[in-house]
C-alpha cells in the first residue's frame, strides 16, 4: 500500500473530475438539449394558470417570496441576478412557481441531475446571486423549503417513483433495470437485492418512502463493503463515505482566503471556529463527493469515541467567488463553475461536523465534515457524543441527494493518505483504507 506524507510543504492537489465524471455521477444533465427540454417543460407547467389555481404556492414558498419582496436590498438582488438570462426562470416569481412544482414530487432516475440545482445554476453564477445566497435570513427560508420537501420525501406518497416504469425516453423509476444497474455499478456484478436490504417481491421493494429507499442499508456489509484490514487493526483509517476523490490538501491553514482561483480550506470557517481547530492547523484533508445513485450512509473511519457533533447552518447556493461569471460549458472539457467550487462550498455550506478521538493515540483526534450540496441539505447523525464506535459502524446519513464529505488529520497524526486517492476520479469505497500509520 503506497502512502504519501500527511503534511509536507503547503500544497493543494485538486482532483476535480471531468464533466463526463460529474455527468456519470448524476450531477449534470446528459446534454444541453436535455437541460433545455427540462427547463421548457417545467416552465410550461409552472406558468399554467389551471395548475397554479389548483395547487397554489406552498406555504414556505409564499413566505420565501414575501421575504424577497419585504427586504429592499434582497429584492434588488433578485432583480439583478436575472439580468441577461434568456432561459427560464426569468424572474423570481417564475422561480417560485418552479419550486412549487419540484417540491411536490420525488426525484426520478434519468438524464437530468438535481432539479433545484438545474434551475439555480445560472443564478448562482452571478454577483447578485452570490450576495443574496450568502444572506443568513434568506438561507433560513431555503432551509424551510427543503425541510418541507423532506417531509414529503419521507412519506408514503413519495413511493410513486419506486417503480420499474419508464416515464419517458429519458426518465424512469428507481426500480427500472437501468437505475438498478447504476446503483450497483461498483459491486462486482451483484444484483441490487443482493447488495441492499429489500424485498423485491413486495410493492416498492418494501421501502416505506423515497427517503427510506435513498438511505437503504447493506444486506451483508462484510460481503460487499468489508472493513479492509479488519476491525481490530487500529493502525488504519477507513473511508467514511462511498464517493469519488475530489481534493487532497496538506499544510491546511487555520485562516485562509476563500477567493483564490485554486480552491483552499480555511479551518476556522470549515470547523465553525471550534476550539479543536488549532489542532488541525498544518494538517491534511481528503475530500470526496458522492454519486446521486450511491450509498448515502456514513461509517466510522476509526475505532474511537465520538467527542463532538456540531450542526452548522450555512448556505445552499453560494458558488466560489473566483468562479462567478465563468462560462457554463456544454462540453466535456471544463466542469461548470459550481462543480469547481466544492472545497469553497465545504467552508460555508450547511454541514455537520463530527470529531472522533481514535483509540490509537498515534492517530488521535480526527474530524469528519458531512456537507449537503444545493438541495441536499440534511445531514443526520445516528450516534451520540461519548459513544464508542468501531471501524465500519454506522455514524449517520445524508438525506435526499448527492453530497460531499471531508476527512481531516492533525499535523501530529502519524497516519498518511494512501497514494491512489491523490489521483483524479478515484472511486473511494466505504470501509476501504484511505490512510494508515507509517510503517
Swiss-Prot record:
Listed GO CC annotations: mitochondrion
GO MF terms, alphabetically ordered: L-tryptophan decarboxylase activity; phosphatidylserine decarboxylase activity
EC main group: lyase
An individual GO BP term: phosphatidylethanolamine biosynthetic process
Top-level taxon: Eukaryota
Keyword Membrane on entry: no
Biotechnology: The pharmaceutical interesting psilocybin as a treatment option against depression and anxiety is being investigated in advanced clinical trials.
Key words of the record: Decarboxylase, Lyase
Listed pathway(s): Secondary metabolite biosynthesis
EC number(s) stated in the UniProt entry for this protein: 4.1.1.105
Pfam family, one: PSDC
InterPro entries (UniProt xref): PS_Dcarbxylase, PsiD-like
Catalytically driven reaction(s): L-tryptophan + H(+) = tryptamine + CO2
Keyword Membrane: no
Annotated function: L-tryptophan decarboxylase; part of the gene cluster that mediates the biosynthesis of psilocybin, a psychotropic tryptamine-derived natural product. The first step in the pathway is the decarboxylation of L-tryptophan to tryptamine by the decarboxylase psiD. 4-hydroxy-L-tryptophan is accepted as substrate by psiD as well. The cytochrome P450 monooxygenase psiH then converts tryptamine to 4-hydroxytryptamine. The kinase psiK catalyzes the 4-O-phosphorylation step by converting 4-hydroxytryptamine into norbaeocystin.
Family to which this protein belongs: Belongs to the phosphatidylserine decarboxylase family.
Protein name (Swiss-Prot/TrEMBL): L-tryptophan decarboxylase
Taxonomic classification: Eukaryota, Fungi, Dikarya, Basidiomycota, Agaricomycotina
